[in-house]
């Protein structure tokens, strides 16, 4: 669900309602009141740091590939910064909760927690999947997406958004979104036999709480949930792309 959740930011006309870390209406169709000066300064710093963090991950991947001459098991070269910066996105829930970013707390929580779940409850917890190529697949998709997304928010907050970044934000998802979803699904699928064998995070009866939980079945349900969500969200994003970029082109004609 991580790519699907993160992509909802782009599906709304302004990349998440100005939301997850940005401000303003990226479509340019109407102006929204942004955060105050102090909040804006903080958000700019936050987005710059997050952009830099994902750039560190990108550079780490490239350096590891050049050193090894292979793309296998590159996850280990960027494991720590990936965990740090993806977990750092939890601050975006706080941004919404205190009102400095005009996005839904519930939607933002879903977006952020789905990725944190995949990082910690799947990839970190099931060591055997960390060398899978599918992990690299979603890591690359996330990395490119986040560099663009945080750059987009930074320039939007500064009221100086280059068209190239706007175009990249509303175009590259066409490839990155399916790529990320594929990596996520394959990683969860690869984790299933190990989760079942170890009984990871599962609670069986009898116990004093009279409660049971099957983590293996839970992961299967998560995978099934991609079926209705992915196509609906993907085509909605395509529709939003046409609307937003066509508006930009029309605006340029009148300048």
UniProtKB/Swiss-Prot annotation:
Region annotation (Disordered) ranges: 11-34
Compartment(s): Endoplasmic reticulum membrane
Annotated region (May be involved in interaction with TECR), positions in chain: 199-215
Enzyme class: lyase
InterPro entries in the cross-refs: Tyr_Pase-like_PTPLA
Residue ranges that the UniProt entry lists as topological domain Lumenal: 62-80, 127-131, 189-218
Keywords, comma-separated and alphabetical: Endoplasmic reticulum, Fatty acid biosynthesis, Fatty acid metabolism, Glycoprotein, Lipid biosynthesis, Lipid metabolism, Lyase, Membrane, Transmembrane, Transmembrane helix
Nucleotide-binding recorded as keyword: no
MF-aspect GO terms: enzyme binding; very-long-chain (3R)-3-hydroxyacyl-CoA dehydratase activity
GO annotation, cellular component aspect: endoplasmic reticulum; endoplasmic reticulum membrane
Residue intervals annotated with topology Cytoplasmic: 3-42, 99-108, 148-170, 237-255
Active-site residues, as the UniProt record annotates them: 177, 184
Associated pathway: Lipid metabolism; fatty acid biosynthesis
EC code: 4.2.1.134
Topology within the bilayer: Multi-pass membrane protein
Reaction catalysis annotation: a very-long-chain (3R)-3-hydroxyacyl-CoA = a very-long-chain (2E)-enoyl-CoA + H2O; (3R)-hydroxyhexadecanoyl-CoA = (2E)-hexadecenoyl-CoA + H2O; (3R)-hydroxyoctadecanoyl-CoA = (2E)-octadecenoyl-CoA + H2O; (3R)-hydroxyeicosanoyl-CoA = (2E)-eicosenoyl-CoA + H2O
Quaternary structure note: May interact with enzymes of the ELO family (including ELOVL1); with those enzymes that mediate condensation, the first of the four steps of the reaction cycle responsible for fatty acids elongation, may be part of a larger fatty acids elongase complex. Interacts with BCAP31. Interacts (via the third lumenal loop) with TECR.
Protein name (record): Very-long-chain (3R)-3-hydroxyacyl-CoA dehydratase 2
